[in-house]
Amino acid sequence: MRAVRATSDGVAVVDVPSPQAAGITDPVTVRPVSVGICGSDLHVIGMGPSGVTLGHEISAIHEGRPVAIQPMAFCGKCSACQRGDQHMCSVGGRRVHGIHIDGGMADELVVDAQCLVALPEGVSAEAASLVEPIAVGVHAVNKVDPVAGMRIAVIGAGTVGL
């Protein structure tokens, strides 16, 4: 199978074995359709060969329907997950597709079924790779819980915040 990985020369399409379901509770194999290139990917590439397939901003086809992929592993049961903070999961650990475990820049990807996000009618799989970066910004706004007239400062030069 083909996959995009960081190499000593930068980035290359390489042949890798089909993905395995190691450490995934309810594994589902998907075929990525569109994968965004994020600043995080550029940092991973800059660190040199990691042996991990790139890409955490992923949309795919599952059972004939387009889906977005929640890229971070989470248990769904710990106190952080129960309050909606899956990114703070104490059980799933820091396992992010494209950074710690294989990402979506490949012919196939194995993800946990709970990481599949069904898309509403009219949202294409091609556009859905932007669900993850949009979710980051929406999550930040929801955490602030702004009200009319409230002053808010956005600090940092990241593209999501801008």
Question: Predicted segments — roles?
Answer:
Residues R2, P27-T29, R151:
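Residues that mark the start of a beta-strand
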Residues V4-V11:
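Extracellular beta-rich ligand/substrate-recognition surface
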Residues A6, P19-Q20, P49-G55, V96-I101, ...:
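Short Gly/Pro-enriched turn/cap motifs at secondary-structure boundaries
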Residues P19-V35, I45-Q82, C115, P120-G122:
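Glycine-rich beta-strand-centered segment in the early N-terminal region that forms part
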Residues S40-V44:
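Cytochrome P450 core scaffold surrounding the K-helix E-X-X-R motif
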Residues K77-I155:
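NAD(P)H dinucleotide-binding glycine-rich loop of Rossmann-like/cofactor-binding domains
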Residues G161-L162:
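N-terminal Rossmann-fold NAD(P) dinucleotide-binding loop
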